[in-house]
């Protein structure tokens, strides 16, 4: 009895196991068949729509020109071939391909509409079974934080719309719920994937805007380039000008003023020659005047420090008279001493020597001082204003002391 009961138990267990395995295998096989059928249908539909849209676009752009020969035949044959393909695969113009699985949408006018990147990625997410079967990507903490704000009651309208408008979501929902996943897990995973896709699109848009702003900021306009070029060209020039600006000379200069025109008009018979002055190292004009009334005249006072003026006058009788050598030697010595002193210590007050056209004598004038040149010229005129009696007295004195002067003159020579 015990052995019969054990054998019946084993047979019933094996039969039940076989039945359950067979049922599960049949269900799995049926599920795989449906997936393969749907996949083949989608691929066939996508291929047909893509070929039809491409053929229509190429046919519209290809224009047969009025040329002759082989080129015209080739273009016409290609146009006919594309027309046949378009007529075979394209739907009628009054129907629109209502399909969410392609990126090209046919319109009644025969044109196509392209999906953007966001729509294409959303379709790929909706038609991928891994979106609903696998755990969400990323950190689990982020998914848990998102679940804290998840409310399926607020998503009922959106869920109903997705089941109506999206065949891929409707097919996957029918297959997977409740066999593979629960109703709540199916929609939680889907909407979290959509949430991640939206975040990714937001980051992509932010990066694109930042790149556009950086490109616009790095591209200078023509006006900015010209301003930079002008500024770069003018700055070194200004620096060079500031560097090489010559300051006003600090060394005093000597000015020689010669009233030659007035002298030539007033004294046409006068002959003038120039002799360098030892003290001031300037040129002072000396005028020699032929006058029979004056034999010789020497100034009793020195006109200016370091200068020597000698005037020779010849009488009409033809007598050659020379001035006393002793005073001349003393003056020469004084002038040499003053010249050495002035070379060691340059004078701070520079004088300008002018040729006086009225008296024929060189008169010093202070540069920048009022009344100095006029006073000195008047003193000189007073010194040279001699009467005839004074001249005769001077001549007699010279004749009396002629011997002494001759000896002094020889010594001086």
Curated annotation (Swiss-Prot):
Residues 146-198 form the BSD domain. Residues 208-219, 255-271, 342-352 have a biased composition (Basic and acidic residues). Residues 274-287 have a biased composition (Low complexity). Residues 208-228, 255-386 are annotated as: Disordered. Signal peptide: none annotated. Residues 376-386 have a biased composition (Acidic residues). One of its GO terms (cellular component) is cytoplasm. Pfam families: BSD. Transmembrane segments: none annotated. InterPro entries: BSD_dom (IPR005607), BSD_dom_sf (IPR035925), BSD_domain-containing (IPR051494). Residues 297-322, 356-375 have a biased composition (Polar residues). This is BSD domain-containing protein 1-A. The lineage of its organism: Eukaryota, Metazoa, Chordata, Craniata, Vertebrata. The gene is bsdc1-a.
């Amino acid at each position: 009895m015990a052995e019969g009961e054990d054998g019946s138990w084993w047979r019933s267990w094996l039969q039940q196991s076989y039945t359950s395995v067979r049922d599960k295998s049949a269900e799995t096989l049926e599920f795989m068949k449906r997936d393969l059928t749907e996949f083949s249908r989608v691929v066939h539909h996508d291929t047909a729509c893509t070929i039809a849209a491409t053929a229509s676009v190429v046919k519209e752009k290809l224009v047969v020109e009025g040329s002759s020969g082989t080129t015209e035949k080739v273009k016409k044959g290609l146009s006919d071939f594309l027309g046949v393909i378009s007529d075979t695969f394209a739907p009628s113009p009054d129907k629109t391909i209502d399909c969410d699985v392609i990126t090209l949408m046919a319109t009644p006018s025969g044109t196509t509409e392209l999906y953007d990147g966001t729509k294409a990625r959303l379709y790929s997410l909706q038609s991928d079974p891994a979106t609903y079967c696998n755990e969400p990507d990323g950190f689990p903490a982020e998914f848990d934080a998102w679940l804290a704000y998840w409310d399926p009651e607020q998503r009922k309208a959106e869920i109903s719309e997705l089941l109506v408008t999206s065949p891929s979501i409707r097919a996957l929902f029918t297959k997977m719920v409740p066999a593979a996943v629960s109703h709540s897990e199916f929609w939680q995973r889907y909407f979290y994937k959509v949430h991640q896709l939206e975040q990714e699109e937001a980051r992509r848009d932010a990066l694109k805007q930042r790149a556009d702003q950086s490109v616009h900021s790095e591209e200078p306009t023509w006006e900015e380039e010209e301003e930079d070029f002008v500024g770069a060209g003018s700055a070194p020039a200004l620096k060079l000008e500031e560097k090489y600006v010559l300051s006003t000379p600090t060394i005093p200069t000597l000015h020689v003023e010669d009233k030659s025109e007035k002298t030539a008009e007033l004294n046409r018979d006068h002959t003038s020659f120039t002799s360098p002055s030892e003290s001031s190292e300037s040129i002072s004009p000396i005028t020699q005047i032929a006058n029979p009334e004056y034999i010789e005249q020497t100034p009793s006072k020195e006109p200016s420090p370091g200068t020597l003026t000698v005037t020779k006058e010849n009488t009409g009788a033809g007598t050659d008279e020379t001035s006393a050598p002793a005073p001349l030697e003393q003056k020469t010595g004084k002038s040499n001493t003053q010249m050495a002193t002035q070379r060691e210590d340059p004078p701070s007050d520079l004088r300008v020597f002018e040729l006086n056209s009225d008296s024929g004598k060189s008169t010093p004038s202070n540069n920048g001082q009022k009344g100095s040149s006029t006073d000195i010229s008047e003193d000189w005129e007073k010194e040279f204003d001699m009467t005839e009696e004074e001249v005769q007295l001077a001549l007699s004195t010279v004749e009396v002391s002629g011997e002494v002067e001759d000896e002094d003159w020889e010594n001086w020579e």
